[in-house]
């Protein structure tokens, strides 16, 4: 019996994992302050989707659920974000991206029912939904063939300008400056990987500048998040501890 005649069809690849959030502050060194569970599906046509559940324990606690999809060229297609803050509903929104436009339909505890439509420079290349697992996906925008060691990503839209992603969700435009550090071999709880090390060094357009953020993703074209460290006032560390 050929694959097409089989009653079942599994043409996609699936990766599941867990990321822990730890404090790097002197008085809380190594204390777990949150966690994230994610599932990534890579379809036969190159499209990919991530579903992530994120928990930040620091008061006021934040809980976030996202579903984010991209096409075969890593271009954003759609995203769903639901957040609660202090164990209370904050907002729920759906985002859609097409050539030249980004749209949002959302309901929030503060703003009520909101519809947004923004013009974009062609098809939006990346969207920040605040799931840590997605942070490494921005790194594909860096041109490693260029002599520039710090590059601007161009336009990016966020689901929230808050550093913890605890507002909205609604569209908010910024750009990001990324520095390429180099290739490394990285060992985390989930194993040892060939990695690319980058650093977010600027967030033009954000109301409050984000502290420098070192991030390591797999060096295999999938940019799977491995670990990250944020300096400044945040002093937090993220690590992939489980991978299935």
Description of each model-found segment:
Residues 2-108, 155-244:
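Acidic, serine/threonine-rich low-complexity disordered tracts
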Residues 99-162:
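Surface-exposed beta-loop interaction hotspot
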């Amino acid at each position: 019996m050929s694959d097409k005649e089989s009653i079942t069809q599994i043409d996609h690849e699936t990766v599941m994992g867990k990321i822990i959030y730890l404090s790097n502050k002197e008085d809380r060194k190594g204390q777990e302050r949150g966690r994230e569970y994610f599932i990534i599906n890579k379809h036969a046509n190159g499209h990919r989707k991530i579903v992530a559940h994120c928990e930040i324990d620091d008061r006021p606690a934040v809980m976030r659920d996202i579903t984010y999809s991209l096409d075969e060229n890593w271009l954003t297609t759609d995203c769903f974000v639901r957040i609660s803050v202090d164990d209370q509903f904050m907002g729920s929104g759906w985002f859609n991206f097409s050539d030249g436009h980004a749209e949002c339909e959302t309901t929030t505890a503060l703003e009520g029912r909101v519809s947004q439509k923004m013009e974009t420079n062609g098809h939006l290349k990346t969207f920040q939904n605040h799931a840590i697992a997605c942070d490494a996906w921005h790194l594909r925008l860096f041109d490693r063939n260029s002599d520039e060691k710090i590059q601007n990503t161009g336009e990016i839209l966020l689901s929230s300008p808050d550093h913890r992603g605890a507002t909205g969700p609604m569209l908010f435009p910024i750009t990001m400056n990324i520095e390429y550090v180099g290739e490394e071999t990285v060992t985390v709880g989930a194993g040892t990987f060939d990695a690319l090390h980058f650093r977010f060094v600027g967030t033009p357009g954000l109301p409050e500048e984000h502290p420098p953020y070192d991030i390591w993703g797999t060096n295999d074209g999938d940019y799977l998040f491995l670990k990250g460290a944020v300096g400044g006032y945040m002093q937090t560390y993220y690590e992939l501890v489980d991978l299935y």
